[in-house]
């Protein structure tokens, strides 16, 4: 929004969306809310079709359920994969189809994770989902390049968001994380804004 784009924010909870959109419009930016759930593929596809044309799609939806690999429940596995992989894949597909149909160049940016390239204790399912995001992103980049559509990922380390709130409520865990990060601090959303804006 700060770069001058009209931003359409999509999430499941209207109350959260309204707060985000209000913050942007109060700052003089152009934004609107769209209630939806990436896990609902048909509804997401219809929503994307309704807001065409699109120039940039940033997929930042994510879910994490941590457990030892030997204790992962099938329901937890399915829930994480449904959002992080299935939802991301088919939303990217819908956006790509719309861009191709409209004859527009564009950019699809998937927010992945450092966990896409490293492992983590109690994070086997999350890591698997992000490895998969890296895989389909690379393939889509090759396939969609001829249509002038770029497809990339941004792979940050721990970023302070509602998704990581539980982790950061544990001081010992925060200390361990910060010792692993060369900057000596946990990342903030603002730290990845430049990369996203560049790729857009």
Regions found by a protein language model. Name each.
Residues 113:
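Residue(s) in the substrate-gating loop at a strand-loop-helix junction
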Residues 70, 118-124, 146-147, 184:
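Active-site loop immediately N-terminal to the catalytic Tyr-X3-Lys motif
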Residues 153, 175-200:
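C-terminal helical subdomain
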């Amino acid at each position: 929004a700060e770069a001058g784009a009209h931003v359409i924010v999509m999430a499941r909870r209207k109350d959260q969306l309204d707060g985000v959109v209000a913050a942007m419009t109060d700052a003089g930016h152009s934004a609107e809310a769209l209630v939806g759930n990436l896990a609902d593929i048909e509804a997401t596809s219809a929503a994307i079709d309704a807001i065409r044309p699109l120039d940039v799609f940033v997929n930042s939806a994510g879910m994490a359920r941590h457990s030892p690999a030997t204790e992962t429940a099938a329901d937890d596995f399915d829930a994480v994969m449904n959002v992080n992989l299935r939802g991301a894949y088919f939303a990217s597909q819908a956006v790509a189809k719309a861009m191709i149909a409209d004859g527009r160049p564009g950019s699809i940016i998937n927010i992945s994770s450092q966990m896409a390239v490293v492992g983590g204790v109690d994070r086997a399912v999350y890591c698997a989902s992000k490895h998969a995001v890296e895989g389909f992103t690379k393939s889509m980049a090759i396939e969609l390049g001829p249509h002038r559509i770029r497809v990339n990922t941004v792979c940050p380390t721990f970023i302070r968001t509602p998704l990581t709130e539980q982790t950061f409520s544990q001081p010992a865990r925060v200390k361990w994380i910060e010792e692993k990060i060369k900057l000596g601090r946990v990342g903030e959303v603002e730290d990845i804004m430049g990369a996203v804006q560049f790729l857009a």
